[in-house]
């Protein structure tokens, strides 16, 4: 089996990504739930391709260790969104919903793949989509940031 290039000393850099376009979508389902012992297993890869028309889920955590390869337990569920402009999403990308910054992508969980991917976002305080006032049709933007987590 091929080695995961981000998990060892295969690449000559810790940051192979130098520029990318935003990934943009629209909220299609709002969530209102929390979990204290969820056990999300974030994959080692810090990048995923998001295809136009696919549905993905946004979940938030305040756990400081949340990063590629980590296990995340304390979460709040935000929303599902449909990708309108596809591209690459990276750990460290800033997530905005309805023009408001939510937090940075911590990593990705594939529990429900191939149905959808769980995008785990690091925030100061985990609140559900309903608690944040997320609305159907809100624009979701995942934007590259120069300062990576």
Feature names for model-found ranges:
Residues 1-69, 97:
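N-terminal intrinsically disordered, low-complexity, charge/repeat-rich segments that act as generic
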Residues 61-78, 116-118:
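Short, basic/aromatic beta-hairpin or loop at an interaction surface
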Residues 78-85:
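Short alpha-helix capping/helix-loop boundary micro-motifs
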Residues 88-90, 95, 134:
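Short, well-ordered loop/turn sites that connect or cap secondary structure elements
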Residues 93, 99-100, 138:
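Structural motif
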Residues 98-99, 144:
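Conserved "cap/hinge" positions at secondary-structure junctions
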Residues 101-111:
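Short beta-strand-centered aromatic/proline hotspots
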Residues 111-123:
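Short, solvent-exposed secondary-structure boundary/capping segments
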